[in-house]
Amino acid sequence: MANKLRNYTINFGPQHPAAHGVLRMILELEGETIVRADPHIGLLHRGTEKLAETKTYLQALPYMDRLDYVSMMVNEQAYCLAVEKLAGIDVPIRAQYIRVMFAEVTRILNHLMGIGSHAFDIGAMTAILYAFRDREELMDLYEAVSGARMHAAYFRPGGVYRDLPDFMPKYESSKFRNAKVLKQLNESREGTMLDFIDAFCERFPKNIDTLETLLTDNRIWKQRTVGIGVVTPERAMQKGFTGVMLRGSGVEWDVRKKQPYEMYDKMDFDIPVGVNGDCYDRYLCRMEEMRQSVRIIKQCSEWLRVNPGPVITTNHKFAPPKRTEMKTGMEDLIHHFKLFTEGMHVPEGETYTAVEHPKGEFGVYIISDGANKPYRLKIRAPGFAHLQGMDEMAKGHMLADVVAIIGTQDIVFGEVDR
């Protein structure tokens, strides 16, 4: 009688370079075919929800940046919208346009990282180099408005921290750059931030084309992604998939279109939808989403150029007065002191607010008991639902395809483990 091969179990991660952080998976293999994939989470658990209950509403805001640390400002946006809904704060129109613009900048940042690292994991190294070149310019936008390249804390309940600056920081001369290269780098930085954004929007679609040239019709890329990790529309909805993971399966659901928030109902853009629900279709959706984000950014930039105005609410129970006023007026000083020591008091109630995060539907559920701190803060992370589909998506595929499936899910453990 022939000896039957026993299934064997291996650990994937948490030190694996394609684990996207601290993913540990126990894989049961029959030869090189996956029989079972069991993700183990919690290695990046930092107790964000509990920590937020011990901080004022403003102090809890920077924790949002650290959830999905590739899409910082969209996390902030969900939190701010939830607080504003509970408190009944009216956000100035200009602030809403700035938020929408930076949410789309963040979407491009996320997709460049997602596609670049996905290709890199599979073995196409060039894509990530091109992706990081463009991400660098968008990181400069973050730095120009907030002073930080990653954890911006730029969105605030009631608006944004400050208006767009009138200039962009320039590259300085160094022994690594000659005068010609320096001039080339600073060419788009001569004017205002909006000039820089417009120049980026003109240039970026060509850079997306370059990425597409590297990957879209690449025979090896298609062999590694077509027909891999297929999810039917029915299973995608049953599993709670959102964002590209749902649209890649052919379900046209985008919170920006179906339940518009901020200024998205005024924007003209399309929703890319996949057909086959595999890794390749999800890649194509992300590519097209970047093009649509450029369209939205252009519309915001046009409006912001001709419509000056306040960028944060004038209700000083929720947002501080300007520093110049605070230093000259007693009432303004009191408001400032109360806000930054005691914090804002949000009326009793509860709300769930969802935004179209680059990875899916990012939701924030807040219960307020009328105090200066949230009574309960629950975060609905899109990646958490996607990771639960790992077993179903990987079953029957080869060991090497696990890497492609993790990449297509675009998992970041800051939000999964919270």
Swiss-Prot record:
Molecular function per GO: NAD binding; NADH:ubiquinone reductase (non-electrogenic) activity; quinone binding
Catalytic activities: a quinone + NADH + 5 H(+)(in) = a quinol + NAD(+) + 4 H(+)(out)
Keyword Manganese: no
Membrane topology: Peripheral membrane protein
Broad class of the protein's primary localization: membrane
Statement: the UniProt record of this protein carries the keyword Transport: yes
Places the protein is found: Cell inner membrane
GO CC, alphabetical: plasma membrane
Enzyme Commission no: 7.1.1.-
Family the UniProt entry places it in: Belongs to the complex I 49 kDa subunit family.
Protein function: NDH-1 shuttles electrons from NADH, via FMN and iron-sulfur (Fe-S) centers, to quinones in the respiratory chain. The immediate electron acceptor for the enzyme in this species is believed to be ubiquinone. Couples the redox reaction to proton translocation (for every two electrons transferred, four hydrogen ions are translocated across the cytoplasmic membrane), and thus conserves the redox energy in a proton gradient.
Assembly with partners or alone: NDH-1 is composed of 14 different subunits. Subunits NuoB, C, D, E, F, and G constitute the peripheral sector of the complex.
Protein name per its UniProtKB record: NADH-quinone oxidoreductase subunit D
Organism name: Neisseria meningitidis serogroup C (strain 053442)
